[in-house]
């Protein structure tokens, strides 16, 4: 298993699926993400994510009536000093439209990619290899770090 390394400079973008793995403590990804979050705290690196992440991670807890999980996601995204949620502004939507046209990403994914690029993120943590279609996005796919 390879490590998930915090960038030495810049911001790290964390996609919604990585927040789900973190909050729900899903193996085998927690073995990658727990040290990552410790390194983020120790290094003072800022983690960026789109407000779209809030929408994505709340669906299951709301559907299942899981108030504890809903609260856990809200706490991590809204009150963690390590995480900055970026609003979905017009500039993000314009960039996302261009990315969607060029790469055929789905709209939410295009919003995530556009946000990361606009914010100058030097690492994009996800479990979706389709983000590799985006020029200039330094994508780390979590499953690629797992042993075969």
Model-derived features: positions:
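Acidic catalytic patch
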Residues: 25, 52, 80-101
